[in-house]
Amino acid sequence: ANEIKLILQRAKLYPLAQPLATIDARQIEDVLKSSPFVNDAQCYKTQSGQVCIQLTQRTPVMRVKADNGDDYYVDNHGGVMPNTKYTSDLIVATGQINKWFAQNYISLLSKSLMVNELWRNQIEQINVLPDRSIELVPRVGNHIVYIGRLPECSSKRKREEDINNFVNKKMDRLEKFYKYGLSQAGWNK
């Protein structure tokens, strides 16, 4: 709320104590939508003289810390969000990542991992190798999980479906290994 107030104050659009006739709801919407953290903004004036502002926030699904020095977040729609002073418990993607690959492939991998409670808690890092194959780094245990290259497709819908199926198949196998293999040998072997 304070960040929104600051955005509106900087743009000289903060509506508190302003005459209703001087408040431009459309301009408030446009300024708020230009924020990298706002997905959508609706602003309107009521019959009773109030100004209502409704926001939907962009939801980061991973943080990218690429070998080339890039450091940013990617949201659930594949959009890039700048790094901020706020921290979030998200999967960190590292390695040979450009923004296009992060937005179109790694974000889909991260989304697929985040919907499963086990993987949301167990996987802390995605590492992209020079050949674009993927390694996953778990929080628990002294091992790296190599899952290979993600399926490539030009259609966004098909790509999302293919990556989700690929991840589910790989992670189902990994879960069985954890359940039946590591339960016998131990996590740190």
Residue map of PLM features:
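Short extracytoplasmic/periplasmic juxtamembrane "stem" segments immediately C-terminal to an N-terminal membrane anchor
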Residues: 1-2
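Charged, solvent-exposed interaction patches on well-folded alpha/beta domains
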Residues: 7-34, 39-189
